């Protein structure tokens, strides 16, 4: 679903936040990549689409509007095997993410012409917010470069190597993907919230 999602969010100016992402959702060259912090985006959103995420934000720290519609997408969007999960789900779309994105594109296509002005206005607003966050990350990346290597700079260097050699970063809380600048699908993997319990690599 990487390519289809990248196209869909650009066409409709939909900002994407990768909160605790275990893989690359959008390439860093996609203008709609809004970083890793949902704070600010949640409270302003009228619709939130959660893509196959068991914990899309920390409920105690960030909250969405009561009037906001929350759409959960994934093979099991309710995570039905979990005894308790406190995230809202106004609409659930069960299925493989790539297939759901394809159906969403088809459903939205007839509305492209009528929504052009609205999308253009949203795009301008979203890009301003994203640029502000990028400037903050750039400042942090280049701050205190006095010989010591911090996580942001290490992540940036690893990302440059991965992009250059079509490599893959496998990380356990070491790499900060928001600084890595990865542009390709399958170029990053981080253990799930269970800390790699029951996982293995070939």
Language-model features: locations:
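Glycine-rich, acidic loop regions that bind phosphate or pyrophosphate groups
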Residues: 18-127
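Redox- and metal-dependent alpha/beta enzyme cores, enriched for Fe-S-associated oxidoreductases
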Residues: 2-16
């Amino acid at each position: 679903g990487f390519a289809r999602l990248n196209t869909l969010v650009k066409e409709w100016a939909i900002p994407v936040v990768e909160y605790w992402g275990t893989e690359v959702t959008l390439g860093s060259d996609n203008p709609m990549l809004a970083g890793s912090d949902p704070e600010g985006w949640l409270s302003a959103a009228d619709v939130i689409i959660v893509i196959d995420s068991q914990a899309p934000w920390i409920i105690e720290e960030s909250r969405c509007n009561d009037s906001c519609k929350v759409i959960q997408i994934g093979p099991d969007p309710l995570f039905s095997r979990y005894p308790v999960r406190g995230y809202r789900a106004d609409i659930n779309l069960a299925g493989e993410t790539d297939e759901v994105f394809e159906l969403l594109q088809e459903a939205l296509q007839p509305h492209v012409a009528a929504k052009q002005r609205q999308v253009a206005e949203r795009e301008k607003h979203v890009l301003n917010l994203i640029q502000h966050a990028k400037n903050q990350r750039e400042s942090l990346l280049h701050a205190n470069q006095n010989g010591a290597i911090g996580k942001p700079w290490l992540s940036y260097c690893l990302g440059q190597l991965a992009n250059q050699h079509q490599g893959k970063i496998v990380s356990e809380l070491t790499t900060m993907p928001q600084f890595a600048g990865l542009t390709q699908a399958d170029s990053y993997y981080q253990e799930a919230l269970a800390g790699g319990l029951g996982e293995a690599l070939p």
